[in-house]
């Protein structure tokens, strides 16, 4: 859920923070690094030109026509900032670069309705790998700077339900594991962990179309830090008490 919220606020941030760059972007210019590389979101200003991931702007050339073919933008020091292929002003494939020359992100169309976006740390290590289906992030994995997986999620193609969602600490210990156990009935298992990696709680869940959310449903076990277990029964998201 936190990653879905992050994606939502990232989209909003792109639309607000970089609105001044877009609508109709002029001929290539040289950019100041501090103004285009956000410490959290990276070089996000070109996302407005990517219709495959929800962009709604067009890039024009110096004559006012929609850009066609390869375009490059640079930093003030002359290093490449952006290289992208445009069709009718829309990005089809592109790479952004840090001022040190390392790739900041790379986007490409894989097949009809399927595209891939990879983001990188300044040292070149993979930061995020996102596969979009029909404009929505279907498969998403984030990494820590040390290469460990921080978060990974897979959704159905129609984005109607989650297939799996897992988060990990920087040392690789699990924090939360949520995965489907019965695709037809939309039944799930969920496990939560303490910081030391010991199990904290586990039990079954189900997807409810009525509330469009996941509910505890069945016998849940909760563990204290010594490992002592207590059991609780849940039905349709409500705990049943005797």
PLM feature segments, named:
Residues 19-242:
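Glycine/tyrosine- and acidic-biased, solvent-exposed loop/turn segments at the edges of beta-strands
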Residues 1-26:
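Bacterial Sec-dependent N-terminal signal peptides
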């Amino acid at each position: 859920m936190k990653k879905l919220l992050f994606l939502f606020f990232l989209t909003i941030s792109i639309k607000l923070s970089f609105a001044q760059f877009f609508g109709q972007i002029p001929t290539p210019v040289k950019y100041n690094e501090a103004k285009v590389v956000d410490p959290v979101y990276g070089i996000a200003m070109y996302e407005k030109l990517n219709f495959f991931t929800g962009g709604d702007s067009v890039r024009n050339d110096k004559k006012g026509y929609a850009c066609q073919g390869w375009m490059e933008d640079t930093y003030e020091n002359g290093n490449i900032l952006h290289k992208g292929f445009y069709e009718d002003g829309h990005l089809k494939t592109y790479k952004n670069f840090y001022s040190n020359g390392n790739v900041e992100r790379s986007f490409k169309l894989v097949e009809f309705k399927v595209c891939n976006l990879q983001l990188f740390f300044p040292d070149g290590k993979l930061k995020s790998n996102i596969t979009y289906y029909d404009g929505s992030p279907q498969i998403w994995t984030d990494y820590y700077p040390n290469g460990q997986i921080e978060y990974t999620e897979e959704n159905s193609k129609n984005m109607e339900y989650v297939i799996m969602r897992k988060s990990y600490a920087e040392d690789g210990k699990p924090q939360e594991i949520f995965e489907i156990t019965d695709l037809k009935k939309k039944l799930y298992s969920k496990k939560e962990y303490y910081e030391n990696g010991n199990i904290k709680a586990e039990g079954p869940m189900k997807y409810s179309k009525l509330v469009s959310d996941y509910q505890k449903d069945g016998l849940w076990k909760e563990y204290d830090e010594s490992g002592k277990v207590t059991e609780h029964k849940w039905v349709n998201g409500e705990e049943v008490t005797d």
